[in-house]
Amino acid sequence: MKTTTRSNIYLPMAAMILTAALAIPAAAQTQVPFKGTFQGNDTTIPPTITTAATGIGTLLGQLSFTQEVTANFANFTDAGSAHWIAANGDSIYTTVVGSAIPGDVVFTVTEIHTITGGTGRFSGAQGSFTVHRTHIVAPSADGTHVTFGSFHGTITSPTAAH
């Protein structure tokens, strides 16, 4: 009889502890807005386009990012990876897929960044965001192309909101 009573008490207690343990990570993984603006330069050595830019964004503060994509100039698409660096050095790593609408003076570029990892407070980060940017067709004196734009989406990270 005592064994049955103990089992009847321990089972609900174990269920409560397990529920609480599983709820803590779920609560810590809250989605938060991720947005900002940037400007920089694109260096094109076909088929590779390398972007280096600086800007400001939520969760990142002052930021820098580098991106390297392989472009398909026949259909104006690209794919590659990017590295976003926050003011304190914490990083977000993404894969990139995008497309461009060509024009005589500018290309209008839209890219989807999917978070693949991070460091510091972005360790364990997940999510995606969209980059909308303008690429100036005429090169600058140094041979690079000016680019500027914005990004918006959501990020889920155990410590991103802190």
How would you label these PLM feature ranges?
Residues P12-A23:
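Bacterial N-terminal signal peptides
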Residues A27-H162:
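Beta-strand-enriched cores of mature, soluble protein domains
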